[in-house]
């Protein structure tokens, strides 16, 4: 296949491709600067901008860190029954919507209770971290 483009000749309007944004840290959305950033994105074109975050099923207290986030959406009680808690996920999506941004949902990563390698679960990312230091319990399938 050969594609030729004459840059001196208009070919038509350019459809916006800037409508989709994303990040690793879901909890950053409701932090001061995350909320502010979502506001700027929503101002681009209200209700036409989408945002996707990783880690929506990761077990944890809901605080953000570099390359990490958590929602505690799925845990298990002492009898190994599922416990679903969408409080943090709702807070994330409510922050998107408050700012005129639509969630582009990626149901991702492994709750600790379902991981075949639950410990260590959380990683502490650094630019020099090797993959075997990062791929901890959150990344293991059941």
Describe the residue ranges of each PLM region.
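Non-catalytic accessory regions flanking glycosidase/transglycosidase catalytic cores in CAZymes
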Residues: 1-142
């Amino acid at each position: 296949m050969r594609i030729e483009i004459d840059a001196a000749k208009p070919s038509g309007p350019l459809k916006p491709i800037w409508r989709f944004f994303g990040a690793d840290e879901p909890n950053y959305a409701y932090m001061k600067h995350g909320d502010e950033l979502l506001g700027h994105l929503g101002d681009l074109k209200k209700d036409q901008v989408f945002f996707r975050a990783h880690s929506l099923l990761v077990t944890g207290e809901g605080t953000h860190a570099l390359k990490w986030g958590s929602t505690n959406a799925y845990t298990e009680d002492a009898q190994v029954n599922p416990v679903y808690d969408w409080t943090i996920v709702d807070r994330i999506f409510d922050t998107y919507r408050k700012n005129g941004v639509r969630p582009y949902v990626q149901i991702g990563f492994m709750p600790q209770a379902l991981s075949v390698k639950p410990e260590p679960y959380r990683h502490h990312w650094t630019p020099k971290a090797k993959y075997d230091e990062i791929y901890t319990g959150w990344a293991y399938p059941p």
